[in-house]
Amino acid sequence: MDKELAEKVEKRRTFAIISHPDAGKTTITEQMLLFGGVIRKAGTVKARKTGNFATSDWMEIEKKRGISVTSSVMQFEYKGKRINILDTPGHQDFSEDTYRTLMAVDSAVMVIDSAKGIEPQTKKLFKVVKQRGIPIFTFMNKLDRDGRPPLDLIAELEDLLGIEGVAMNWPIGSGQTLKGLYDIANNRVELYRKDGEDRFLPLNDDGTLPDSEALSQDPQFKDTLDEIELIKEAGNKFNREKIAMGDQTPVFFGSALTNFGVETFLNSFVDLAPAPESHTVNEDEELSPEDPEFSGFVFKIQANMNPNHRDRIAFVRIGSGEFKKGLDVTLARTGKPIRLNNATEFMSSERVQVSDAVAGDIVGLYDTGNFQIGDSIYSGKRKIVYPALPEFTPELFMRVTAKNVMKQKSFHKGMNQLVQEGAIQLYRNYQTDEYILGAVGQLQFEVFQFRMKNEYNSEVEMNSIGHRVARWIDPEQLDPQMSNSRNLLVKDRYGNPLFLFENEFAERFFRDKYPDIKLTEKL
């Protein structure tokens, strides 16, 4: 084993942040970047009029609407560790991008609005993380506002998500009466100060404050002591093994907006989160991150991160070995050799040329059309193929045409590049070859329309076709005569045939009429 490579890999902490929209995910990301020294000022997503946009929201539509619609990658050094943050869209219409991103991380941070508790999108994303069996860390956000009782929030983790919650700190008040946090893990009190200055009070051996501290006589602090005693007696016991397996989540309270409790959370996270671990490749082989042969997989493709160059970047999670500039790799899907001369690291849309990266890191490769989402690349003679990434079956479909027939070239270029990102699916009518777009949610169409105009100067006309159910069919079983007014025969961008049904009733009618025909769907 290469000792130097092993030491580099051990320093990596690669994680995604998941939440329901508006729980504060992007804000806590910015505060972490502040502690990492990569930005000097956090811009809140609400501050669109001031121009203080969130660092992770780099796309033009994100700045205009104050939402994240694409996963961002940010990297920085912190306390001797290399931190790779993947900030994901919270909006449910972009869950496919988020799901794929979750395949590229070693742990996850779940941000919950303490006034609302666990919300639908958080629940969906948690299931994906849970299936992967990776550690999950919970940040109960917005403590500076009135919220639900902390004991209820902890109980909800087990009731709704089926995961043990173990409190690492505990609120002393909330909202207007917030006094601070009782730091169980570090045996101290972190006082709440609106100026953002840290002030910590050490606790006595018995967990109380010295009598000389005014807070020791505060009724809220005494209530907190009662709750702490209850937690220690009846609550879940901290267990590193359970955390590593994803069966227990350390819970931290705080306020990302006022930067309260974030540094304490980050310090604990860096200590508890895992370094990169082995991947299953070639269906049943374990591949160590310290394996000397480089390998990785493409989990995201992004067009126009630099609108001036109209480029495409393939995001690669390195699974093993070390990347060096000029590395020769093989694209597993085609067997094509590729030399990796230009690779970048990220601070959202900002890029830095990288000459060295190891397992756990995320690098961006300039893509001239070689890569597809889910592709595996490897440097040695041994072929390495990572597991397939999840694909979703769209539920909304629209016909799309260029408003200006004289701009067909930019229309087709924009269409092809945005579809290759995987956030929207492209189909073509089997008979007429007209374009049909498929998406999980309406917002994806709006973003597509905006980006076509903004990035490709191509205005598009979009009309709903009213079909909601997509099912693939074996080409050998296909008879075009099966198509009628209630099921539209189309082909996906790989040429595979499928039917778009009006609704589930139309699908059932088809299945009853053709019982020997096998129809399949994606996620």
Swiss-Prot record:
Entry's Gene Ontology cellular component terms: cytosol
PANTHER family recorded: PEPTIDE CHAIN RELEASE FACTOR RF3
CDD domains: RF3, RF3_III
Gene Ontology MF: a single term: GTP binding
Family stated for the protein in its record: Belongs to the TRAFAC class translation factor GTPase superfamily. Classic translation factor GTPase family. PrfC subfamily.
Record-annotated tr-type G domain positions: 10-277
HAMAP family given in the database record: Rel_fac_3
Compartments it resides in: Cytoplasm
Protein name: Peptide chain release factor 3
GO biological process entries: regulation of translational termination
Functional note: Increases the formation of ribosomal termination complexes and stimulates activities of RF-1 and RF-2. It binds guanine nucleotides and has strong preference for UGA stop codons. It may interact directly with the ribosome. The stimulation of RF-1 and RF-2 is significantly reduced by GTP and GDP, but not by GMP.
Binding site for GTP: 19-26, 87-91, 141-144
Species of origin: Lactobacillus acidophilus (strain ATCC 700396 / NCK56 / N2 / NCFM)
Keywords: Cytoplasm, GTP-binding, Nucleotide-binding, Protein biosynthesis
Pfam families: EF-G_D2, GTP_EFTU, RF3_C
Cytoplasm in keyword set: yes
